[in-house]
Amino acid sequence: MEKFLKPNKAVILLQGKYAGRKAVIVRAFDEGTRDRPYGHCLVAGISRYPKKVIRKDSAKKAGKKSRVKAFIKLVNYNHIMPTRYTLDEDLKDVVKDVVNADVLQARDKKVTARRTKARLAERFKTGKNRWFFTKLRF
């Protein structure tokens, strides 16, 4: 069977705190690991989407509305829905030191999420991957 859950593939999370949020696969663990003996992947996604900016908004308000908040998480394959989209932004170097689950603890996770946030915010401001930065309507 061909592996289609590859890095840079956009997915939608189906379960948990970030259900309904869009994310991108950073690294896939098809065979599982010792801690998680099932197929899972490391995803980086958007926990708070940027709001729509209108013409009459001041520069300060427009800046606040275009903020992006990111997260990183290990997710079971059963809890994601792949989409046809891919992000050409490679986030692998942002989370290069993430090899196992114990690296994803509170402090390191926050630092990595902050670096991911900066990368995604830059992507949003350039106007690329517009679909990824819009809230999913359902």
UniProtKB/Swiss-Prot annotation:
Gene3D superfamilies listed in its UniProt record: 2.30.30.770
Example of a GO biological process term: translation
SUPFAM superfamilies in UniProt: Translation proteins SH3-like domain
Record keywords, A-Z: Ribonucleoprotein, Ribosomal protein
Coiled coil location: none
UniProt GO MF annotations: structural constituent of ribosome
CDD domains for the chain: KOW_RPL27
Listed PROSITE patterns: RIBOSOMAL_L27E
InterPro entries noted in UniProt: Ribosomal_eL27, Ribosomal_eL27_CS, Ribosomal_eL27_KOW, Ribosomal_eL27_sf, Translation_prot_SH3-like_sf
Gene Ontology CC: one annotated term: cytosolic large ribosomal subunit
Family: Belongs to the eukaryotic ribosomal protein eL27 family.
PANTHER family: 60S RIBOSOMAL PROTEIN L27 (PTHR10497)
Protein name: Large ribosomal subunit protein eL27
Source species: Solanum tuberosum (Potato)
